[in-house]
Amino acid sequence: MVCNDITFPDLERELNNPTDLRVFAVAEAVGKLDIDRIHELTQIDRWFLHKIRNIVNMEKDLQGHSCSDLPEDLLRSAKRLGFSDKQISLSLGCGKLEVRERRKAAGIVPFVKQIDTLGAEYPAQTNYLYLTYSGEEDDIDFSDSNKVIVLGSGSYRIGSSVEFDWCCVNAVLTLRDLGYRTLMINYNPETVSTDYDICDKLYFDELSFETVADIYEKENPRGLIISMGGQIPNNLAMKCMDYGLNVLGTSPESIDSAENRHKFSALLDELGVDQPDWKELTDLDEAQAFANSVGYPVLIRPSYVLSGAAMSVALNDGELKSYLSKASEVSREYPVVISKFIENAKEIELDAVAKNGELFVYAITEHVENAGVHSGDATMVLPPQRTYLETTRRMKKIGREIARALEINGPFNIQFIAKGNTVKVIECNLRASRSFPFVSKIFKLNFIDLATKLIMGIDMPPIDKSCFELDYVGVKAPQFSFTRIKGADPVLSVEMASTGEVACLGDSFEEAFLLALLSVGYEYPKKNVLLSTGPFESKALFLPDAKRLRDLGFNLYATRGTSDFLKYNHISSQILNWPLEKREPNILTFIEEGKLDLIINIPKSHEEVELTNDYIIRRKAVDFNVPLITNLQFAERFIDAIARYSQDELAVKAWDEY
């Protein structure tokens, strides 16, 4: 709320219009407007406005001091108001650790309190704990030994969801089986990891370096496991190590070598592992020179970000300038790398666990969609159905080389792109990925259980290779919430958009694929299909699928360009006018009247969020709950599947029946 550089050119307008930034506008306003005027504009209760003014006044009081002359009473008051060490350091103009050591020397440390679950009617003895500076003593003692802290995944958002919570919970359960006292730090009441019976102590507090270090110094555990909760705990690795906290598993230096785009790209060059041409961002002129030398499109990749935040595909100099500005803002402390974006390539992932630098167990999953769709939004298949044996062999070889070079001890994930006989590495995460629960369920082999045992130094025998010989197929499909996000363009890109996922098994890919799609809300098309298949290349690639739809008895409707192409290739279709043409028969009318059962709309470029006809069609399809396909490879596999199975032919079987 304070200690930031957010300002508003029209403050009263910002106060009068509720947005996710209005609380910052209120903080700015309490120093410029009276409370009654702010209340009139926001309708926020005056009690809250006075409390916000107290916080703003504290920031001003802090700014009148330096770290060396800061009064202890003022520092204690700031901590009781909720100021973090970082906020105080920004106000004083000094370092975060300087503030930390200053307050510790003054005896200003948080106390551990139990959350009262009994409404203060009786003393509550719970393992729900939190930190506060408004206390005089701890509610618990810290004499227990053999403790391990697991950092959770934090709040659910796009990119961090229940998959990482599954990893955290399974790590805790394995630690308990091994005889350790388990401590979980997490602050999301939606998670299973914050259930009272999962761990020995639950610290319901934020996942920041300050909080983790405070709890670590209170508890004095054997160490921290940060590799299960996704990107948020992973980002704390170097800070924890630099402060002297024991990070269990893969070393923080290795984590940094993988997360830092420049370091990882340099490592791949050193190992002789192929990767797309790349360059670290220095300035716009150099970026444009690189893009023009390798040819557009290019991919912009910030470091240490969640779910591909600010990752973009630029098609020209104008887009490059816009996206670089966004990426630099999101990833200020770390480098932004530009690389050649390889079109029409397959994306494949390696989820693995390593034991002291040696590959211990792995799973190779294939994306249905070509590269350019974020792995969290992609439809994933295990075992791979269309990946060459030589490609998987080379992926394993590269995985072993990277595991050795980074001395990985625990879970990791590598993303590859393959085109023809060429395999290139695009990313590596030295933590559990969101597909670990999926591969564990498909193989019926808990990768997190194995990873946790290896992290704790348990000597594990090799896994029997028969575990990986499957006579069924698993498919993981993404769940989107575009209906809840007004105006969002429901098209897939390199930045993640899905909010959930479903995995299904089948005796064949097509069966598992259809079951997964039905589970996330798709419906079998009954009669009418609209085709808008994008640029000429896409039209040509989709032609066999259009013929198959016709042969299956579907009525084909199409936009003018697609219809002309189909007619030239002897496929009849009825033309529907574009939304902006305002003539009947119009696509919007057909959608609104429920006359279309499926819409296949292939965008003309990777990223264009403008109010075009294509966008209007996609948005209207989502708003009227008409199944929508925006990816060419997905459309092809979907048509293959409905040609092979009717809905009545899909088997309903339990997971343990496979």
Show where each model-derived region lies.
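Acidic/histidine-enriched active-site and ligand-binding environments that engage anionic O-linkages
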Residues: 290-298
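Conserved A3 ("GATE") glycine/threonine-rich loop of ANL adenylate-forming enzymes
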Residues: 259-262, 305-309
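Iron-sulfur-cluster electron-transfer modules
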Residues: 79, 85, 91, 130
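ATP-binding N-terminal substructure of ATP-dependent carboxylate-amine bond-forming enzymes
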Residues: 101-106, 110-273, 282-289, 507-649, ...
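ATP-dependent carboxylate activation and anion-phosphoryl transfer catalytic cores
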Residues: 1-63, 68-74, 78-82, 96, ...
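Short alpha-helical "recognition helix" segments of helix-turn-helix
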Residues: 37-38, 87-89
